[in-house]
């Protein structure tokens, strides 16, 4: 069987890795730069401040302080910046900021004059190759967005989730310095870490998996699970481990996409506002139970998680969520059994559900939802 793997992102990971940022930007010789940030606190970082100062005459700072970016929010920042002819976007923030940054690179290439036109273009995937390069600087450890070529955009008004997705939109570079994530609240840090674990696990069993992605996935799971207790206790070294694990998980699923956990989680986040990492991790054990007959070398997967069975994994994830202060059952988030039909109908995301090794049906999706109700 042919195995192929491709990811062109230059990665710089570890404490102090931000020291390369100014040099990276300089090597690209950009005419205009957009520095997109989550909030202004990141500008206090020595190396980000140094970069902003070095290119002050060609650099504009914009703040995007929204989680799970909505279509109208993306349009607003696009409309504010579309005439600046940026040649480089530096996105500093969590997955939402990185997703908006990489989306803008594509949107700048094919101008639109209304929110509806942008929605239609993204839905039909008729956007062009990116107009500019981007550099990803994550301030959370979980999404892996800095090493993937797609971005998630939500459209709650129409109860939909879209992707801005093209192989040409990998970052020029990813700079993953755990110092930026060290001030994350524990609940957010754990949710992000569990999102990365799900990226890795789903990559491991995905139909599109390959030798390299599976190796990266196992490493990511082990690193994160070995250090998540330290994260719960606030240990500094745990943040470095989470940054490394998240990057490896991103490198794994950048080639495979995700599967049923993500597919079923989207309506849970949209309807009940369950944080993404919490929603996917709640589904991890029941989806693994469904997939078990199709997972090759599942003992390796159990070993990476530090468990011997799906039941033990379920208990472990539930305990982690509860220790972090996140409810682990749908009913605790306001879900009702009468919602199941609607949830099932919106759980079959193309490219996710059909990438799952076990076929997803209305019956088994409802069973999965009931198991975490």
Residue ranges and their predicted role:
Residues 197-201, 242-250, 264, 284, ...:
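Short alpha-helical scaffolding segments that buttress acidic/His motifs in well-ordered protein cores
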């Amino acid at each position: 069987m042919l195995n192929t793997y491709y990811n062109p992102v230059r990665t710089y990971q570890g404490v102090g890795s931000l020291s390369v940022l100014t040099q990276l930007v300089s090597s690209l010789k950009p005419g205009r730069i957009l520095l997109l940030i989550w909030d202004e606190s990141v500008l206090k970082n020595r190396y980000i401040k140094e970069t902003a100062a070095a290119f002050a005459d060609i650099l504009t700072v914009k703040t995007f302080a929204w989680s799970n970016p909505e279509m109208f929010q993306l349009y607003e920042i696009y409309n504010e910046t579309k005439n600046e002819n940026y040649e480089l976007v530096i996105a500093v923030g969590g997955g939402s900021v990185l997703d908006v940054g990489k989306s803008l690179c594509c949107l700048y290439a094919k101008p639109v004059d209304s929110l509806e036109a942008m929605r239609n273009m993204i839905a039909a995937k008729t956007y062009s190759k990116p107009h500019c390069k981007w550099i990803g600087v994550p301030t959370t450890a979980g999404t892996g967005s800095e090493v993937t070529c797609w971005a998630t955009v939500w459209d709650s008004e129409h109860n939909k989730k879209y992707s801005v997705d093209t192989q040409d939109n990998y970052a020029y570079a990813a700079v993953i310095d755990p110092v930026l994530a060290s001030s994350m609240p524990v609940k957010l840090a754990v949710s992000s870490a569990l999102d990365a674990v799900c990226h890795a696990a789903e990559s491991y069993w995905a139909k599109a998996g390959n030798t390299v992605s599976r190796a990266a996935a196992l490493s990511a799971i082990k690193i994160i699970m070995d250090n998540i207790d330290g994260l719960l206790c606030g240990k500094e070294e745990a943040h470095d481990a989470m940054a490394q694990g998240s990057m490896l998980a991103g490198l794994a699923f950048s080639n495979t996409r995700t599967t049923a956990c993500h597919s079923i989680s989207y309506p849970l986040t949209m309807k009940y506002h369950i944080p993404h990492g919490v929603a996917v991790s709640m589904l991890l054990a029941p989806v693994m139970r469904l997939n078990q007959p199709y997972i090759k070398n599942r003992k390796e997967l159990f070993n990476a998680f530090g468990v011997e069975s799906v039941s033990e994994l379920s208990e472990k994830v539930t305990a982690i969520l509860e220790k972090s202060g996140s409810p682990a059952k749908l009913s605790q988030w306001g879900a009702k059994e009468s919602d199941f039909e609607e949830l099932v109908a919106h759980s079959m995301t193309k490219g996710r559900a059909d990438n799952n090794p076990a076929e997803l049906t209305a019956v088994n999706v409802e069973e999965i939802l009931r198991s975490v109700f």
